[in-house]
């Protein structure tokens, strides 16, 4: 008989098992297994943009609970890890780390620095993900900036061009003047800002005064019309007339339009190109001229005696207001708080510029995408409304051009050849991946083309994250079509709720456009990890928790336990109390296993190898049979919860069974029989040990998806040298049930509870002898009565049925 280790050292054991799992390739994907037997995960590729925090652990471990369960259920698991290492987030990290600015450097030099930084940052992620025991197959790793990913992303672009779902046009777009790039609607956030509503005097062409209210007087030089509501009786007389702008004396038409709010300001609104989306609508609807006065750097480009040329937006606003005051053209100012559209990354207020960009058709597909949202299995279900709300709110096609550097280039050039100037030239699929700054289109010389200098929105590549792993886009565009067909659509997309409008939406859009399908069958949405005061963790607040310190203090299994205690989709707080409970559970598992281990050498070898169903007849004691029935019920419930992605419920059920049913009750009740030092009941002893053997084995398997290290260590000490985490190791007791009256065992537990409370109230040890237990309301079988005598230290028990409810009289 081998010895049970004295203590459990989580630091040593977790490192040991992580290394063994890697060496033995426990989590390796098998490409030869049929598609129907494979479970495929579209793992979120973390953005390489900054410090690792406990939120990474929180979200990724929740996915791993489901993955480990599916593997143990017999699925061949395709569980890759990617790194979203291209695009603006990475550029901002590099600029901050290296104290540089991309636009001040040679493009190729900046890209080289980006590549060095992401390689270093990705190694930190790999280390953390291994420490928290993510059961990924690292041979499936990808980077969104790798040559293969660039090839697949460019394939996606060409496929959508071929399907006429992508177009290039010179139209108003959202522009971030800080990062110097166009943005998509999903890249913006609304911020409440204080400002002034400025009431300014215009005049009609006939010299009559008009008062117009605006928050952006600096756009006066770009004013192309003044609007009023067609039902506004105050201004109907202005129909067909013109207005003269103050300071700049430009004549612009006075026009009626139903989009004007009569109750806002004075009911007269100036239309500038461009202050907001309404300006764009009016500009298009009324065929107005274009006056561009804002540069890509967010400064004014307008030569005039007001001398606002070259000023930043805020500076120009202040100067215009001062001049209006001097010339008595500013009637009044009102303090207001209004919503301003800002860049999600830089935080800068956005401008609307007219710049040639690439767009993916989105608005025309809104109804189809709403249907796709309904076809998808949402976990939890209430997250679907977030996608539906976003789809309904979309008012722009998806702008995928970015005026940056470290990203996937467009496989595009523009011809300078005589007679076809400006013609768009696309790369041949056999050329991919290409960089138009270095490569050339087939049949053209360097002098005959102008490359597209832009790169794609990082979401344009992240939106094909399933395809980055499957190595294909469609029937016409694939690196490995057989692999793609086998893995796509995938089974699961895990992700956070705040990127439903971006990552989930764009991935669904791309799959719909490429192959008229969903990208996955299920989406599993996690919440945020909040600080203990329920505020969002942020470095500025100093409340970010670093995983390394927690891993050093508690170990991976305890942190995973904390993560498993939060329901899917719910925001949770970091809790020291939950961490301590997890540590307590690990210790209790160790001690419970140590207790049952000392009895296992009394079992026959063939009974240890047999399944619980095969040795069913050898469990003879009534309370043992009740225990097995409860175990079977637990397995069914926990399995059902995990199949429905409700890992927290499965964990709670298993933990409660372990503490209450096993440790508090069964171990104590069966202890005398298990030891049977006087050999009074060898059959009862064998029955209890066999029950303990299978109960502990089953519980370790139920805990295994959540706490992989302690369960592996105990499983190999108690049961097998094979890993507990291998494919098909889950338990299935669907055909197992003992035909017994559960009221007897439950009555025993009720009596025991009464006795325990009695002794506790009198400050007596649980082992304090009892002369007589007088029990009414139930009569236990001889086996159960014997177990009750042993656990309560009763010399004698008398039963009678005179009461409907159980009552106990205790005589010491």
From Swiss-Prot:
ATP binds at residue 539. It is found in: Cytoplasm. It is an enzyme of class 6 (ligase). SUPFAM superfamilies: Anticodon-binding domain of a subclass of class I aminoacyl-tRNA synthetases, Nucleotidylyl transferase, ValRS/IleRS/LeuRS editing domain. Its EC number is 6.1.1.9. Belongs to the class-I aminoacyl-tRNA synthetase family. ValS type 2 subfamily. Monomer. This is Valine--tRNA ligase.
């Amino acid at each position: 008989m081998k010895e049970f280790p004295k203590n459990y050292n989580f630091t040593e054991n977790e490192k040991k098992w992580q290394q063994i799992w890697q060496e033995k390739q426990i989590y390796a994907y098998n490409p030869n297994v049929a598609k129907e037997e494979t479970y495929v995960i579209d793992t979120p590729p973390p953005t390489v943009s900054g410090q690792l925090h406990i939120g990474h652990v929180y979200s990724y471990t929740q996915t791993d609970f489901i993955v480990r369960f599916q593997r143990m259920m017999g699925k061949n698991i395709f569980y890759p890890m990617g790194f979203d290492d291209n695009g603006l987030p990475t550029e901002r990290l590099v600029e901050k780390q290296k104290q540089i600015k991309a636009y001040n450097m040679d493009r190729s030099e900046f890209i080289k620095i980006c590549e060095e930084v992401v390689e270093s940052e990705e190694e930190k992620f790999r280390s953390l993900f291994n420490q928290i025991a993510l059961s990924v197959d690292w041979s499936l790793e990808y980077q969104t900036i790798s040559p293969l990913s660039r090839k697949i992303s460019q394939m996606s672009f060409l496929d959508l061009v071929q399907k006429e779902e992508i177009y290039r046009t010179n139209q108003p777009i959202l522009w971030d003047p800080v990062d110097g790039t166009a943005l998509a609607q999903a890249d913006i956030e609304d911020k409440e800002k204080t400002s002034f509503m400025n009431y300014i005097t215009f005049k009609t062409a006939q010299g009559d005064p008009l008062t117009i209210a605006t928050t952006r007087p600096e756009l006066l030089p770009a004013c192309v019309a003044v609007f009023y509501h067609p039902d506004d009786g105050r201004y109907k007389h202005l129909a067909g007339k013109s207005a003269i702008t103050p300071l700049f004396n430009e004549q612009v038409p006075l026009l009626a339009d139903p989009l004007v709010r009569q109750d806002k300001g004075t009911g007269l609104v100036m239309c500038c190109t461009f202050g907001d989306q309404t300006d764009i609508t009016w500009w298009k609807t009324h065929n107005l001229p274009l006056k561009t006065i804002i540069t890509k750097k967010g400064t004014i480009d307008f030569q005039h005696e007001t001398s606002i040329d070259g000023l930043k937006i805020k500076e120009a606003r202040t100067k215009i207001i001062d001049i209006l005051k001097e010339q008595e053209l500013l009637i009044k100012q009102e303090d207001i708080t209004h919503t301003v559209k800002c860049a999600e990354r830089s935080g800068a207020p956005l401008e609307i510029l007219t710049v040639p960009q690439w767009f993916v058709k989105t608005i025309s597909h809104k109804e189809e995408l709403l249907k796709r949202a309904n076809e998808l299995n949402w976990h939890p279900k209430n997250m679907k409304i977030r996608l539906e709300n976003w789809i309904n709110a979309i008012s722009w096609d998806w702008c995928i051009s970015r005026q940056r550097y470290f990203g996937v280039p467009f496989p595009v050039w523009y011809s300078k050849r005589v007679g076809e100037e400006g013609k768009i030239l696309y790369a041949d699929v056999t050329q991919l991946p290409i960089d138009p700054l270095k490569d050339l289109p087939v049949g053209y010389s360097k002098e005959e083309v102008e490359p597209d200098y832009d790169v794609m929105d990082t979401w344009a590549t992240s939106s094909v994250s399933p395809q980055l792993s499957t190595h294909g886009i469609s029937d016409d565009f694939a690196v490995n079509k057989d692999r793609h067909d086998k893995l796509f659509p995938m089974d699961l997309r895990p992700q956070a709720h705040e990127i439903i409008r971006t990552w989930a939406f764009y991935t669904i859009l791309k799959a719909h456009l490429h192959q008229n399908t969903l990208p996955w069958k299920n989406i599993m949405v996690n919440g945020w990890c909040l600080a203990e005061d329920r505020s969002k963790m942020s470095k500025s607040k100093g409340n970010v928790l670093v995983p390394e310190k927690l891993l050093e203090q508690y170990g991976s299994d305890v942190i995973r336990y904390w993560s498993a205690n939060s329901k899917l989709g719910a925001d949770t707080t970091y809790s020291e109390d939950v961490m301590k409970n997890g540590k307590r559970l690990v210790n209790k598992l160790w001690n419970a296993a140590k207790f049952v281990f000392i009895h296992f050498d009394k079992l026959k070898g063939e009974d240890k190898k047999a399944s619980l169903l095969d040795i069913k007849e050898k469990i003879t004691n009534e309370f043992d049979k009740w225990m097995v029935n409860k175990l079977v019920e637990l397995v069914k419930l926990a399995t059902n919860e995990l199949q429905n992605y409700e890992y927290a419920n499965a964990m709670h059920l298993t933990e409660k069974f372990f503490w209450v049913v096993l440790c508090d009750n069964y171990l104590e009740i069966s202890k005398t029989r298990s030891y049977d030092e006087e050999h009074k009941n060898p059959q009862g002893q064998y029955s209890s040990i066999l029950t303990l053997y299978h109960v502990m084995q089953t519980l370790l398997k139920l805990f295994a998806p959540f706490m992989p290290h302690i369960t592996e260590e105990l499983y190999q000490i108690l049961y097998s040298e094979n890993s507990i985490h291998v494919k098909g190791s889950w338990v299935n007791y669907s055909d197992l049930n003992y035909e017994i009256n559960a009221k007897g065992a439950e009555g025993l537990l009720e009596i025991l509870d009464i006795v325990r409370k009695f002794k506790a109230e009198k400050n007596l040890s649980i082992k304090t002898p009892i002369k007589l237990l007088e029990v009414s309301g139930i009569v236990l079988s001889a086996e159960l009565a014997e177990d009750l005598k042993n656990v309560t230290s009763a010399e004698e028990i008398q039963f009678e049925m005179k009461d409907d409810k159980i009552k106990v009289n205790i005589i010491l």
